[in-house]
Amino acid sequence: MGFHQISVIIVVLALASARAADEFPSHTDTPTDCPEADHGCWCHGSFAQCWRTYEDSRMTEEIGNRITQLELLYQPSEEVVTYIRRISALRELRISEDGMSLDCSCDVIYALDDKQVTLVNQAELTFGNCRERGWPRERMAARPFVHRCHVLRMQDGETRKRRGADDNDGDDVSKRASPRKGDEPAGHKLKDLAPQNTHHLVNIHDADKHPASEFVNFISGHRRSRRSTDDDAAVSDDSERGARKKRYGNQGNYPQAMNPQSRGVNYGQPAQQGYGAQGMGGAFGGGQGMGGAVRGGQGMGGAVGGGQFGAFSPGEAEADNADYDEYSDSLDEGDTTISAAVMDDIKAVLGATKIDLPVDINDPYDLGLLLRHLRHHSNLLANIGDPAVREQVLSAMQEEEEEEEEDAANGVRQNVLNNINANAPGNAGYGGQGGMGAFGGGGGGMGAIGGGGGAMMGQQGMGGVPQRMGGQPQGNAYNQGYRQG
C-alpha cells in the first residue's frame, strides 16, 4: 500500500470522525445488544446512551429488557421519568446536564424510588428552576433535593392516611358520645326523619329476612299488640304504664294495681295534701271515701257487688288484670325472647354507645329505655338498610315518644291540681273515713267548699245503692290513669 492510499484512508477516517462528532454526543462502541445509533441511542461503555425522547428513539421492549445501565443526555424531567418507567431491567441511571438543567420536580426522585433505580452521579448533579415550583432557592444540589423529596413523600403519606381514617370514621357510630341526661336528642325529630340510602352496619344473612326483623317485630308487634285490636276505644293502655310504675313505685300518676280478692278495693292510706283518709272497703263493696279540701270525696261502694263510685269498677279491674295476665303469659311462652345473635345485631346497629347492654328485652321499661336511647341516636337508624324495617323502628319509637309526652303533660297537670287543692281555703277538710259495712257502703264526707260527690247516707242493711247529694262526683279530666265516675 502506497503512501497515497494511506493518506486517503486517514482523511476518510478523519471526516467520519468529524461527522460522528457532529451527530453523536460522544464516542461509543457498538455491541450487538445496543440500540441503533441512528435512532438516538447507542452504547457507551457499559451504559446505553440516549439523547432523544423515548418515542423517537424507537426503544423496543426487547432492548429495554436488556438495558440495566442508562445515561440520558439533554432530556427534560418528564422524559427522564418516562425512560425510568418504561425500561423494566434498569438498575443504574446517569443524568447529564449538558445543554439542559433538570427542573426541581420530585417526580424524578419518586420514579427512581418506585423502580429501585440508583442515580449514580448524584454528587455532581444539580436541579434548577426551583423557585417556580415553590422551593426557597433557584438551584439545589441533587443530594439535599433527594432528601427533601423523601421527606415530602413521607409527609404526604401520613396526610393521606389521616384523611382516609377521617373519611372512614366520619360516620362511625362508635365515636359518637351518648348525650348527657337533660340534653336535647341528637338530630331531627323522629317525625322529620326520612329514609336514607346508606351503608349497612348489619349484615343481611337472608335475602327475605333482615337480621333486625325479630327485634323490630318484637317492638312493633308484641309490645304494641294491644294497640292493634279492633276496638281501640275499649282497650286501655294502662298495663304498660303500670309496668313502668311497677319498676319505680307509685310515681308519675300511674294507677295502682287493683286487689282482685277485694274486687278492686283500695285500702285506706294516710291523708295527703289536705285530703281525708281513704275509706275502708267492705267485704263486697269497694270505693274511696275521701273528704276533699276543695272537692267532695267520692262515694263508698254500696250493695253487694261493689259500688260504682270507686277508683275502678270490678269489671274494669278484671279487664285490666286479664290483660296483664295475658301479657305476662305471652312473655312466659318464650316467643319474645331475643336471641344472642339478634342481640349482637342490635349492638351492631347501636355501635359502641353508652347504653347498658344487654337490657331485659322482656321488661317494658327496659325496652322503652332502649327506644329512648335509639331516639337520642336517631341518626343510627339510617344504618338499617331495609326501608321497611327502618320505618317499623321509626313508628315504634314515635309511639314511645308520643306516649312519654302524654305522660309528662298529665303529670304536670296533676301536680298543678294538687298544689291548688293543697293551698285552697279549708285545707284541713271535713271529710272523714267512710264506714265499713257488711252489705251497705258507708257515706263519704262532705268537703269544706265543694259539694260532696259521695253518698251521704246508704241504705243500711238493705244492700241498696247509696243516694248521692251535691251532683255528680267531681272527676279529674286530665289524668287518664284514674277512672272516676
Swiss-Prot record:
Fucose-binding domain, as annotated region: 371-379
Provide ranges: composition bias, Basic and acidic residues.
172-192
Indicate, by first and last residue, each region the UniProt record lists as having compositional bias (Acidic residues). 317-331
Which residues are trimmed away as propeptide when the chain matures?
Answer: 21-247
UniProt KW Signal keyword: yes
Give the matching Pfam families: Bindin
Q: What residue stretch is flagged as signal peptide?
A: 1-20
Recorded GO CC terms: acrosomal lumen
What name has this protein been given in UniProt? Bindin
